[in-house]
């Protein structure tokens, strides 16, 4: 990847949406990291060219006006949260637990659940995923995670519920691993059938 500081973007050899599969042969998912743990810069993968770009607001690079991200944040490539099904038309969001990763990293992960939210009325599901490393080998569900660290999910939920301000993002509830897998498969099928719309 090439960092283009003048244009506030990271240029990838691959289109980070179209050229990477959502699911691997071992049923792990691929996650593209947009915002590392502890970061306050709002970046996203562009739907137009698949490169990572710093979002702009009122002519300036966007920063989160809240505490930094409590978790690595990114997308599952080759997916879309369908507008027709109440989503926002973007690739499926992922919160990725574990150590801090670099922006643009592509990581194999295992989904263990879903954080269900609404953002300005749009469905804004966020898949909860963990790495398949020694620390997380026994974490295969939200129950496993709670048994290991009861505060982790609450910390993540509270952050996403409040970082945009009061009464903007609504927490709907949690979904288990099977529900997360169903959401992922639906988003893959919709992407394969319709692709991503640019508006």
What does each model-identified segment do?
Residues 1-199:
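Hydrophobic N-terminal alpha-helices or hydrophobic patches in metabolic proteins across all domains
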